Amino acid sequence: MDQLAHHFSEHIVELNRRVAEIIAREKLSGLVIHSGQHHRQFLDDMNYPFKVNPQFKAWVPVIDNPNCWLIVNGRDKPTLVFYRPVDFWHKVSDVPDAFWTEHVDIKLLTKADRVAEFLPKDITNWAYLGEHLDVADVLGFTSRNPDAVMNYLHYHRASKTQYELECMRQANKIAVKGHQAAKNAFYNGGSEFEIQQQYLSSVGQTVNEVPYGNIVALNQNAAILHYTALEHTKPAQRLSFLLDAGANFHGYASDITRTYAFEKNSFCDLISALNAVELAIIDRIKPGVKYTDLHIETHHHIAQLLLDFNLATGDAAGLVDQGITNVFFPHGLGHMLGLQVHDMGGYLHDERGTHIPAPEAHPYLRCTRTLEANQVLTIEPGLYIIDSLLDELKQDSRKQQINWDQVAHFRPFGGIRIEDNVIVHQDRNENMTREFGLID
């Protein structure tokens, strides 16, 4: 924790530097950042689970308390207006006293609608950052989520501070424990629901605390890219298991995927081959490399796997050029990772918001930036048997290059995805996921 405290001091200095630069450029007095508010369920008296504004948790690891505010101007100590109502219905958050509190000026707010008393007297030249524009209107903000400010913050968010990197290491360390427990639950005969419970118990987080809905997929369910159904019934035959699950630490996410075969067979060999592809692509990561180039290179590796495992015929370059690899690997290679699972800034060329579009042939790629030191990325190649995409392919001449008997052989296994979280350093890569022990 001492190391976190040391890094947090530097983190706040860097965030203040960024704010000072952008508000000077945009002639603003400062930023007022709203943690967010509860959303009430329609025709009900219950709220949806609260999700904090990522711009807010960049400054303080307060991720579960609505109606909080930050007042920052890049010069003075940030002011945290911390919501602490008098409430006998709900648990009221304790006044923070952790390592980071010495770096902010904490003021307590007991009634959410009295926040104006804590804001600058004249907010004409202050920008509101947050989701609730109706609240911003009531408070009198005329500058709300200005594009120039948001683009600047999102662009620079890709460059992680040492504090952020340490938080993400801890998020990986926690998630690795969950993955190991889930793997054991799979081999011990657990259902998807039971495996999920083992994972959550091991990471010590609820379904609303982990950074995204876990994908716990047995057998053919692994072909559904964002499968979250969680069947309670155990399958009659246990073939494969895909787990895409992360953990949260101080508001920072990990995002890890592994795939397992229940028995030693050709699907197990395919997993090993894709694992080798993933590691080869990670070895290619270094500052100056375009993420788009890594994605396209991965498609050539996938093409070779299709040939090696007799799923397709022809040559690797042709399979890529004809879009056949897109049928088996339809998503992007990965994305930026941080305060959000799909962290902001992945398409930005510069701090003014110049957009770098994904290649026309690869529209689902979530990152098109040139890599730099201190960025954190996921690398997650996949290979799936997705019937809806294969049905489209059957409509044209490309169907002749597919070995449909081999497709049928692999269909019950669903698919494979392998995903690690990687820090780009100037002279090396740091594969956090593997370094914490999730080797396979």
From Swiss-Prot:
Lineage top rank: taxon: Bacteria
EC number(s) on file: 3.4.13.9
UniProt keyword Protease present: yes
GO terms, biological process: proteolysis
Keywords: Dipeptidase, Hydrolase, Manganese, Metal-binding, Metalloprotease, Protease
Gene Ontology CC entries for this record: cytosol
Gene3D superfamilies: Creatinase/methionine aminopeptidase superfamily, Creatinase/prolidase N-terminal domain
Known cofactor(s): Mn(2+)
InterPro entries from the UniProt entry: Creatin/AminoP/Spt16_N (IPR029149), Creatinase/aminopeptidase-like (IPR036005), PepQ_N (IPR048819), Pept_M24 (IPR000994), Peptidase_M24B_aminopep-P_CS (IPR001131), X-Pro_dipept-like (IPR052433), X_Pro_dipept (IPR022846)
One Pfam family this sequence matches: PepQ_N
Cofactor binding, per record: Binds 2 manganese ions per subunit.
Record: residues binding Mn(2+) 2: 244, 255, 419
Catalytic activity: Xaa-L-Pro dipeptide + H2O = an L-alpha-amino acid + L-proline
GO MF annotation list: aminopeptidase activity; metal ion binding; metalloexopeptidase activity; phosphoric triester hydrolase activity; proline dipeptidase activity
Signal peptide (residue range): none
Binding site residues for Mn(2+) 1: 255, 335, 380, 419
Function according to Swiss-Prot or TrEMBL: Splits dipeptides with a prolyl residue in the C-terminal position.
Homology family: Belongs to the peptidase M24B family. Bacterial-type prolidase subfamily.
Protein's recorded name: Xaa-Pro dipeptidase
Organism (species): Shewanella denitrificans (strain OS217 / ATCC BAA-1090 / DSM 15013)
Encoding gene, per UniProt annotation: pepQ
